[in-house]
Amino acid sequence: MVRLEKNDPLMLARQLPIKSVALILAGGRGTRLKDLTIKRAKPAVHFGGKFRIIDFALSNCINSGIRRIGVITQYQSHTLVQHIQRGWSFFSEEMNEFVDLLPAQQRVHGENWYRGTADAVTQNLDIIRRYKAEYVVILAGDHIYKQDYSRMLIDHVEKGARCTVACMPVPIEEASAFGVMAVDENEKIIEFVEKPANPPAMPTDPTKSLASMGIYIFDAAYLYELLEEDDRNENSSHDFGKDIIPKITEAGMAYAHPFPLSCVQSDPNAEPYWRDVGTLEAYWKANLDLASVTPELDMYDQNWPIRTHMESLPPAKFVQDRSGSHGMTLNSLVSGGCIISGSVVVQSVLFPRVRVNSFCNIDSAVLLPDVWVGRSCRLRRCVIDRACVIPEGMVIGENAEEDARRFYRSEEGIVLVTRDMLRKLGHKQER
């Protein structure tokens, strides 16, 4: 776990988060997750057996000492808003603590959607100014990671930066999906290009590029000035990565913060964990990794808990069916309210209230809340969306052509099943 260095003033570590406000950009649709995000924004997608993706950014804020948070919403925000209202309403108004929901206001140009990530903040500037923060922490609400933002704040102040960008090396073949930077010996950013077709390699490792994680810290007054200027620029795309960060880089005011310095992990020798889970395969793989014997992401660390909305559910139950078959599981996450009757579940993640009936075999599957699996089903390498009713005898994940005809099948062979897909096949979704 991250610890302050001995020469770091403890008072600074305590005061900087109090002087900060975090703004979580949570309006993204996440189109690469296909039908998983038709009715919910990507930050509201379920993850890890009981959480939503946005819980990680919110928990990082709380654990870092930042208790003034704005969540900027847009696409299909109802599920996200409901989750935050139910699970994140424990703040003390008397202590000036809050999670403020900031939907698209159409204040500036009367458009239906935010024009870019920077415009999402600009449209809410009148509200954000009232927070009277000295520092603004800009976060994406759709990434899985654990980070101590107070350590990044200290780095920001000690370097005398006006803007600090969290960064980490990524394989050069994947770098086109990120903002890529070059830094000098003092970690000042000397070049920044958003999603380049030919990403430059790191001088120390030709196989990797230094990528922005979309995590920024700004001096508040400086940020407001930049956003107002950007808003007047008709040629701008009003995006942090495309417009704001390159401009600050040209002015020599942007610094990089290596993610390993503030990444929170139980094993100090492990690789820093950060996942985008932006594709179906990445989402499926990140969920299943949590069910492994030693997952890369430790969610059992009591020093850095991941919080969420907690439902009052009975414990999971594994029962013997009438034929004598035992319900059993191996290397899996099984949440509260689940019942497994006379079936085998291996290397899978079952969210709350999943019911698996007799003679089923569930292998390498992610079953979202309220899924009901009929008798004698075989489910493999799949993601089953919330409240799906899988009919008796259905087989998923064994025949590529059949899977692609009935459902969505990714190039990597991961199958996504939704209620609408099952209805089109004539299967009733009420039980």
Curated annotation (Swiss-Prot):
Pathway: Glycan biosynthesis; glycogen biosynthesis. Beta-D-fructose 1,6-bisphosphate binds at K39, Q429, E430, R431. One of its GO terms (molecular function) is glucose-1-phosphate adenylyltransferase activity. Keywords: Allosteric enzyme, ATP-binding, Carbohydrate metabolism, Glycogen biosynthesis, Glycogen metabolism, Nucleotide-binding, Nucleotidyltransferase, Transferase. It comes from the Bacteria. PANTHER family: GLUCOSE-1-PHOSPHATE ADENYLYLTRANSFERASE, GLUCOSE-1-PHOSPHATE ADENYLYLTRANSFERASE-RELATED. This is Glucose-1-phosphate adenylyltransferase. It comes from Klebsiella pneumoniae (strain 342).
